[in-house]
Amino acid sequence: MIIYLHGFDSNSPGNHEKVLQLQFIDSDVRLISYSTRHPKHDMQHLLKEVDKMLQLNVDDRPLICGVGLGGYWAERIGFLCDIRQVVFNPNLFPYENMEGKIDRPEEYADIATKCVTNFREKNRDRCLVILSRHDEALDSHRSAKELHHFYEIVWDEEQTHKFKNISPHLQRIKAFKTLG
């Protein structure tokens, strides 16, 4: 089972494309939709939905995957639910760049203070990070600097922030999922 979390643009047709691409790895790909505008509510909703899926799951190596803001959530929810994560261009600093786009961006900073201390150290090697060198929305080098101590970083030379085509990375993701 692969759980897919969309980014801030929940209506992007690229979400359906990524789900179809992920089905080459596992036929059971589940998209969880969330508001993107209410961080504390989103966290509760995502935890509840992922837990529900895991309770009914027969796959002993589930994976959670997210792009952009979905990558932010996939890393955290995956850690809290003890499943491996794959994140594409994760938005690691939404409290800085979501101002004016959502109702309460400061909730992201509050969530960070309430998260497990040094959670990335405890999550070491359980997240695969795929970053675009041509991310027009986020500073991918800042993300790499933040994450490379804990996770493997894979650089993509062609995709932009929304990562329309993940197919060049499917074999790597499949191998990472298999390690589960």
Swiss-Prot record:
Question: Which protein family is it in?
Answer: Belongs to the UPF0227 family.
**Segments forming a coiled coil:** none
This chain's protein is named: UPF0227 protein CKO_01948
Top-rank taxon of the source lineage equals: Bacteria
InterPro entries in the record? AB_hydrolase_fold, UPF0227, UPF0227/Esterase_YqiA
Signal peptide start-end = none
Q: Which Pfam families match?
A: UPF0227 (PF05728)
